[in-house]
């Protein structure tokens, strides 16, 4: 891929661009909103992990996150170090009864594993005793609603999106009728839970794709922003979970066009973003900082000296040019550049034989008013597109949480 026009390809030698600014409050929820760049440069919260400072190994292994509640776990929950996304396809002749049976089993199994308890469907129960903050979050792809005869109950924004500009989507990382997002502080806990869910689905749903990601492991100091594989700070700008702004962005509420079963749910857009790291390594510091719109070392928006300062979108350099270039990622991802559109972002790094990058997760009550408009803007002109390419994309409706005795998706299946 080519580098941005203003980029020089020498290593080092450049003075860092002038500091820049964006206040934590006003920038919360902006950075990284949208395209490949949104996840990679502006901030995918989970790309850095969320381990508490000073936790011992025994405490980490025994930690439990409640499975039952008004919302599914794994959304508002602080993102742990390990994650796996497992997508399944339903057979063409799948019945509503078959889907309901599978979801009953998955719900029961996931609830037990989250508590560190054994379950009759767990093929390796000896691995269940250390959940390590395990969460399992289930989602429904767009075709599921057709399969069960409830097309009219599909939430807005749950669709197979066509490729955006610069996307090179591959079937092996895209689509799916069902999703299990499995997260924990320990990779054994994650893999064990994923394998148990796959085993329980046999004969009712077939594995479509599976991708694993990682962030910082337990021990990263609380309150610090970590970095993705490009060296950029990731996670600076999300709204704080539990706040009114966060709730409005994430949780579906009753209103026109919102199916009753979906109230209390949300939508996950999962994008696999490959990083073209060699050109990024070769780019100068000035090119990197002007591509993102932030200082590489501090994470401060150009023109400020504070990572959480307001992004000075109107600030100019002495020669009259914009302090933050018109094609910089933070400018194009900023809500002020997108009529206020925002999303909650999480992400995990990946590295395998095919390359390295980020598994980016955009979370919105309605992706048509958050992810989609921002993604479209970034896809059209973000300099970060010179270094990143989305190779996978899928959208899933996440049902609300359940009480003991209920199963995930029951309000839809029995609607």
Where are the language model's segments positioned?
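N-terminal secretory signal peptides
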Residues: 1-22
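Long, histidine/aromatic-enriched segments associated with O2/redox biology
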Residues: 3-4, 21, 26-47, 52-415
């Amino acid at each position: 891929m080519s580098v941005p026009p203003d980029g020089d390809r020498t290593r080092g030698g450049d003075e860092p661009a002038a500091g820049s600014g964006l206040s934590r409050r006003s920038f919360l929820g902006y950075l990284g909103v949208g395209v490949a760049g949104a996840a990679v440069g502006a901030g995918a919260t989970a790309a850095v992990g969320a381990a508490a400072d000073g936790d011992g190994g025994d405490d980490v292994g025994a930690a439990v996150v409640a499975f039952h509640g008004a919302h599914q776990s794994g959304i508002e929950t602080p993102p742990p170090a390990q994650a796996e996304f497992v997508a399944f396809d339903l057979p063409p002749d799948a019945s509503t009864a078959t889907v309901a049976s599978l979801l009953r089993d998955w719900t029961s199994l996931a609830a037990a594993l989250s508590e560190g308890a054994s379950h009759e469907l767990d093929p390796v129960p000896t691995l269940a005793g250390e959940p390590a903050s395990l969460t399992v979050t289930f989602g429904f792809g767009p075709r599921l609603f057709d399969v069960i005869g409830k097309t009219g109950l599909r939430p807005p924004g749950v669709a197979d999106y066509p490729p955006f500009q610069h996307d090179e989507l591959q079937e092996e990382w895209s689509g799916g009728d069902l999703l299990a997002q499995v997260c924990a502080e320990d990779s054994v806990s994650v893999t064990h839970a994923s394998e148990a869910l796959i085993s329980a689905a046999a004969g009712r749903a077939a594995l479509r794709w599976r991708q694993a990601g990682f962030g910082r492991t337990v021990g990263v100091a609380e309150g610090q922003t970590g970095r993705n594989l490009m060296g950029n700070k990731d996670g600076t700008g999300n709204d704080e979970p539990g706040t009114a702004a966060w709730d409005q962005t994430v949780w579906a509420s009753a209103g026109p066009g919102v199916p009753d079963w979906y109230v209390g749910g949300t939508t996950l857009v999962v994008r696999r973003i490959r990083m073209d790291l060699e050109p990024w390594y070769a780019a100068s510091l000035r090119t990197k900082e002007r591509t993102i719109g932030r200082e590489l070392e501090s994470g401060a928006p150009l023109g400020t000296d504070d990572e959480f300062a307001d992004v000075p979108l109107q600030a100019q350099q002495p020669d009259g040019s914009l302090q933050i270039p018109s094609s910089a990622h933070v400018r194009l991802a900023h809500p002020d550049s997108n009529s206020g559109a925002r999303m909650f972002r999480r992400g995990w790094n990946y590295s395998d034989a095919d390359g390295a990058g980020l598994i980016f997760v955009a979370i919105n009550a309605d992706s048509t008013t958050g992810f989609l408009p921002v993604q479209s803007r970034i896809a059209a002109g973000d300099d970060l597109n010179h270094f990143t390419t989305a190779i996978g994309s899928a959208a899933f409706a996440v049902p609300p949480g359940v009480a003991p005795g209920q199963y995930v998706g029951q309000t839809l299946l029995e609607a």
